[in-house]
């Protein structure tokens, strides 16, 4: 992963729920109390890059009355709503029915990062099953539209799964990412990793078809 990887930067900017373990002067504005001390036990949402540093660091203080409280971490954190119990249960029931992009545009990257910070064996198993099930569906849709010459682009220019409405445009050098009905709804729910997978599968199918057509012409 490159230092300048935009997807990685956006993933690190995702906010997760955190609980402060100590009082911090002048940080009350994080809890809508400007000019006040942020009290121990306050819950605030912090970007992953900051939460990770605060969770790993410790205060370095020594409590002579209660040694167990010495050198506490500044914060503890929980899984973000995108990886909450409701989402996990829905993925267990039918991975293909959940629009992952509605949870997070970088769903798998977010989940991977969170699992690096904490042990979540159940979540890991659910995500593996989810990716495999959805990858098969993505490959199926990629084959269905692999022979066309039009390209579907959302307003954000991201293709399948892009936010906002899009339109089909003719582009000999672009992938045909358009598909109708329920299939289009599924593709709009793809996260960034899945969109890249779709493009690769689609372009591979298209290239194979073009190669076969050229062979037949010889």
Curated annotation (Swiss-Prot):
**Gene Ontology cellular component?**
GINS complex
Q: What PANTHER family does the database record attribute to this sequence?
A: DNA REPLICATION COMPLEX GINS PROTEIN PSF3
Subcellular localization: Nucleus
Q: What is its main location?
A: nucleus
Record gene name = drc-3
UniProt keywords (A-Z) are: DNA replication, Nucleus
Source organism of the structure: Neurospora crassa (strain ATCC 24698 / 74-OR23-1A / CBS 708.71 / DSM 1257 / FGSC 987)
Q: What is this protein called?
A: DNA replication complex GINS protein psf3
List the Gene3D superfamilies: 1.20.58.2050
Pfam families, sorted = PSF3_N, Sld5
Q: Where is this region: Disordered?
A: 147-182
User: What InterPro entries has UniProt attached to this entry?
Assistant: GINS_A, GINS_bundle-like_dom_sf, GINS_Psf3, GINS_Psf3_sf, PSF3_N
Presence of the UniProt keyword Nucleus in the record: yes
Q: What SUPFAM superfamilies does the record point to? A: GINS helical bundle-like, PriA/YqbF domain
Write out the function statement from the record: The GINS complex plays an essential role in the initiation of DNA replication.
For bias type Gly residues, the affected ranges are 147-163
Assembly behavior: Component of the GINS complex which is a heterotetramer of div-26/sld5, drc-1/psf1, drc-2/psf2 and drc-3/psf3.
User: Which family is this sequence assigned to?
Assistant: Belongs to the GINS3/PSF3 family.
**Keyword Nucleus attributed:** yes
Q: Which biological process annotations from GO are given for this protein? A: mitotic DNA replication initiation
């Amino acid at each position: 992963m490159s230092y300048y990887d935009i997807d990685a930067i956006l993933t690190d900017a995702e906010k997760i729920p955190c609980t402060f373990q100590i009082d911090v002067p002048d940080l009350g504005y994080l809890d809508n109390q400007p000019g006040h001390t942020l009290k121990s036990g306050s819950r605030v949402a912090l970007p992953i890059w900051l939460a990770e540093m605060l969770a790993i660091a410790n205060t370095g203080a020594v409590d002579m009355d209660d040694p167990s409280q010495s050198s506490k971490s500044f914060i503890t954190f929980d899984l973000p709503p995108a990886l909450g119990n409701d989402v996990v249960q829905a993925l267990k029931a039918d991975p293909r029915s959940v629009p992952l992009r509605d949870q997070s545009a970088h769903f798998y990257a977010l989940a991977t990062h969170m699992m690096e910070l904490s042990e979540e064996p159940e979540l890991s198993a659910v995500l593996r099953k989810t990716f495999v099930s959805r990858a098969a569906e993505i490959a199926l849709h990629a084959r269905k539209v692999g022979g066309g010459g039009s390209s579907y682009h959302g307003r954000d220019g991201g293709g399948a799964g892009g936010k906002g409405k899009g339109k089909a445009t003719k582009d000999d050098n672009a992938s045909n990412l358009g598909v109708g009905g329920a299939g289009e709804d599924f593709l709009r729910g793809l996260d960034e990793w899945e969109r890249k997978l779709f493009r690769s599968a689609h372009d591979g199918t298209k290239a194979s078809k073009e190669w076969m057509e050229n062979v037949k012409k010889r």
